[in-house]
Amino acid sequence: MGMVSRTATTAALAAALILGGAPHAGARDGGAGAAGAGAGVAYSDTTGVGVHNAYEKSAYPYFTDALDSGAAMLELDVWTNVFGRSWRVSHSNPLGNDNNCVNAANADGLRTGPRDQDLGGCLASVRAWHDAHPGHRPVVLKIELKDGFQGKAGRGPAALDALLTARLGDALFRPADLVGGHPDLDAAVRAGGWPARDAMAGKFVVEIIPGTVEKDNPLDTLWTDREYAQHLRGLAAAGRLREASAFPAVLGAAAGDPRTRYADAGLRPWFVVFDGDASFYAGGGSVDTAWYARNGYLVVMTDAHKVAPAIDGVNPTEAQARERVALLAARHASVVSSDWRSLTSVLSSVVPRGGAGR
């Protein structure tokens, strides 16, 4: 179990077994599934389980199957370059769509019609599923912009907001919903700004991160995270923050406050979501993960299966997966991410963050 204390891990594991011992009633029907965590518990005081690249056909036949899994987070990869049309959803095809989305108009179409739709089609299916499952658990939709925004091609931050709003509308939990009367996101969460889980029922939180191609492009000097944070700051200054639909994440685990990487200190308060390698967060003293929980920041811990001792990334035993979730909950994960798509009893579990809440 690495350097995580046995006491903390045991406490979190016990909580996991109590709260997530079997699939909750909403694992297949989309119910909120948060009752075990306590109706009044803040969203930021719980740990859920997410699925990496849930849009791939090898993961689920249809994206609605991913939504039905009970997972707390589902990931989409999106391409924006000028050599293709629209916002493409694919892992490795930068020019077209390769995914399990069907552009459903309603619940009857969630498993019919052609797949390989663009982001708008994926979001249409999300909305159709949402309408068929009122009060469903809160779900993070993690969008990796593989090659970043392309504002000159009509695929910049404002265009993404418009698309998300057109497709998901009132199903979105927006930055403005969190900010309230505070000056920025950081001030809001430090004041206890995340609502209770039951108040988040029926909502989607959109997280956006820089993509692998973008990060490797020496000509791209304005990555997704910084570009969207600038967008948020500008909207807030203009009194139009309500138009924003997503939360930019600081990508990459690091000791201290990772936001210090942004030379423009005025951008830092617009980041309250952090996303990085689970092994680094679980490594012990180099990262004070309790700092994130104390301040109400969300932390997505990726590649959970690679934390020592490594377990299977797709088909571990249920006991192995539950123990891993408990270990990372003890390290203050908000979302534990891997490819455990068939373990619906684990995906639908909600445990106290830190083992016993913040």
List PLM regions with ranges:
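Secretory targeting and sorting signals
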Residues: 1-28
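Catalytic cores of phosphodiester-bond hydrolases, prominently lipid phosphodiesterases
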Residues: 33-358
